[in-house]
Amino acid sequence: MNKPFLILLIALIVFSGCNMRKYFKPAKHQIKGEAYFPNHLQESIVSSNRYGAILKNGAVIGDKGLTQLRIGKNFNYESSFLNESQGFFILAQDCLNKIDKKTNKSKVAKTEETELKLKGVEAEVQDKVCHQVELISNNPNASQQSIVIPLETFALSASVKGNLLAVVLADNSANLYDITSQKLLFSEKGSPSTTINSLMAMPIFMDTVVVFPMLDGRLLVVDYVHGNPTPIRNIVISSDKFFNNITYLIVDGNNMIASTGKRILSVVSGQEFNYDGDIVDLLYDKGTLYVLTLDGQILQMDKSLRELNSVKLPSSLNTIVLNHNKLYSLEKRGYVIEVDLNDFDSYNVYKTPTIGSFKFFSSNRLDKGVFYDKNRVYYDRYYLDYNDFKPKLYPVVEKSASKKSQKGEKGNAPIYLQERHKAKENKQPLEENKVKPRNSGFEEEEVKTRRPEPIRDQNNATQQGETKNNESKNAPVLKENAAKKEVPKPNSKEEKRRLKEEKKKAKAEQRAREFEQRAREHQERDEKELEERRKALEMNKK
């Protein structure tokens, strides 16, 4: 087959598949109003991660809003914000200095370094490029405002506890430094990872161990208290080749939740639970986990990853904010989704309009810098605070009438058609009672039919009397039956609520059975492992 034709055919298949993708387009009656981003930033967002964002003017937004930190323009290095931890702003920096052989003076070599990278001359680049982490105190009265620690390669995530700095580097190495002496206390490198998700989790210090979120889908647990730092456990979450870094990590007492883009792991009092799916983002709050998936699902789970509630939308969701018992998420085609945490079946959709001459979503797609914290969502140079969420509500729009109602059925017809039917019904008896012409030829027959028939004999009369008495006796029974028939049917809302409660009850029973089954499986597995170890010990003794 001709090679250009084959390439063209493949391209057509790919683009046709892209064109068939369904985008979120809610019906008019689903859009409740408009959600404005009324607050302005000085500049637009240039870069962001899970813990902060940098604006064009160097200002930094953290999890509590705009910080006092300003990253100035420096031609000798490039800085990126990693995290705010234990009173320090942590910055990762790439040095771009070049040493001139003739004058031994520093010169900017950013363009040359880029060219060398493109050519693949790694040795020359290493001579001219350096990497470091800078810790800047958020206390203006601190004795030492800045601490710089040199690194072997670029830092992706970091956190501080006391005098220790835990860093995960771009070569998938976990490092532990003494901040005062800048001494490397521990380092372990994993398998390299070529592509990673920008939502990178940070290391977490616990009482005696530090948990490193690695780039190859595992958690490295290092004991830093008892003697020299020593790795004591490797927890493999996922083994995918691409985008397999740990994107979320949180510790809550004896419970830990971690996630990659494909799997969630929950450790509850030593027991492990997994959930597999295409995971966009997640948020843990007060013992409950909220998950966004690639196919538009919003899931509510407990610690053992049992599904409590869910709603599926044909949408591409981004950001999770919980406020006033509601979950808010930003849809990439220009909508704010509001889900009631008490009733996942009911959700509201708000459209994000244009702001002045600035089109909020260019090409109806979320394609600019985004960052969110506990109460706010930042987009480009605007942000929405859900503590003061006041959408502009539209007038209530009813659902479009069905085909049957459009044909004119009384039960499901629109109100104005029902009124017409009522008018017709009221007119019909008037037409029957109209005075007919006297010489119509039917008068005599009508008069005859109206006359009561004479009672032919006494027996018939007594029978008629008995039937009347029986009718009078049966009258209460008939009234009772009529009353039973007239008992109003349960309201559709009540019926819906009852069915929903039954469904929830059945779901809860099913979850309880699944939980018991998992617990039994874990217990059997542990017993099996103990038995195998016991046998192995006996064999070694022999």
Swiss-Prot record:
One Gene Ontology cellular component: cell surface
Gene name in the database record: pgbB
Positions of the UniProt region annotated as Disordered: 399-542
Superkingdom of source: Bacteria
Pfam family, one: PGBA_C
Compartments reported by the entry: Cell surface
Function: Binds plasminogen, specifically, and in a concentration and lysine-dependent manner. Plasminogen is the precursor of plasmin, a serine protease that cleaves fibrin, fibronectin, laminin and vitronectin. Acquisition of plasminogen/plasmin could enable H.pylori to degrade host components.
Protein name per Swiss-Prot or TrEMBL: Plasminogen-binding protein PgbB
Other information: Plasminogen bound to PgbB is capable of being converted to functionally active plasmin.
Organism from which the protein derives: Helicobacter pylori (strain ATCC 700392 / 26695) (Campylobacter pylori)
